[in-house]
């Protein structure tokens, strides 16, 4: 059991949970993730470890409420517990050793690029982070990323920072020169757009793929992705890959495989949750892209 020791709402549908997991906190490296199961018989889902506190023995998970399981997790409160947390899994981020790195985060992907930006800054690399959100209330992890270097904020409606997409700010930086590597995490269309943008500049671009995943150890094959025409597995070969080699169209198609079943499960959970005693005070979460 992994008790929840802190909870915070970062945006209308993104929640931060800090849970006890001392063994994972001790050995986790940036870019790695855990497989979480709320309770017996529950769905297993991958979540990136956004931060750790080795002294306290805790890890931080940032969760976007989209389907039944993520809604269930974000409805938990301090004192509740998550039954199973397996990890750390996946390969650590291959960090740029010197120069200028640009970390691009879209939506909840911003929480995934934060530990990368943090590690880069600690290694003396110049870090510029670009954060994207629909509007000001959807921008997350701004303070954390400002502690790592310069930050450019882009909102779709112009309510905060620049009016426009993260790719527009990224293009400006690429045009100015001096960018040695880009790390991009967010919705598949965003990662694809960032990768296509940097291709003519020959700037290495690393993306983190949040594929459908069950065991996280390469046994089920559910997280397979096409990389440079070859099949690889996000759990054991990734989760990070060269964005210029990823077949984003295939990945986007695979992510919709169980959409109908996911929607049915969410509707059933929402109905049951609304009918449960004390549900009137429960937090409501809107749906959004990753």
Predicted features and spans:
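Local cysteine-cluster metal-coordination motifs and their immediate loop/turn environment
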Residues: 112, 188-190, 210-240
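FNR/FR-type flavoprotein reductase catalytic core
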Residues: 68-214
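Ferredoxin-reductase
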Residues: 1-78
